[in-house]
Amino acid sequence: RVVDLTRVLAGPFCTMLLGDMGAEVIKIEDPDHGDDTRDWAPFVEGWSTYYLGVNRNKKSVAIDLKSDEGAALLANLIGSADVLVENFRPGTLERFDRLWNTTQRSNAVLPARNAACSSPVGGAASSKYSSE
């Protein structure tokens, strides 16, 4: 089981491949608007082809990660997961103290992977845009 806290392209593509290989992927989305790519053209019958392309073979659930109830739901999912994939900017998960504590406590052997497009070290990290 894969808990997918990713959005846009790099992370969803990574978890799409895991789903293509048979993993159960549970994508966590914001309850207010879902993944940003749900609104990206082109559309077929009202559905974003971009979103559908990189989010196939996934179950999707809307969870408010900023609420206590959302953190508890995430903790339950992580507790039953084999892998956690997220692609927040470096340090974002840690800023959500409740989520960071949840990911650290729930499953001690859970491999967590950041599928970021930019590196937290090197040229990208030292650019003037690295904190944006």
Sequence positions of predicted segments:
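N-terminal helix-loop segment corresponding to the beta1-alpha1 unit
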Residues: 1-131
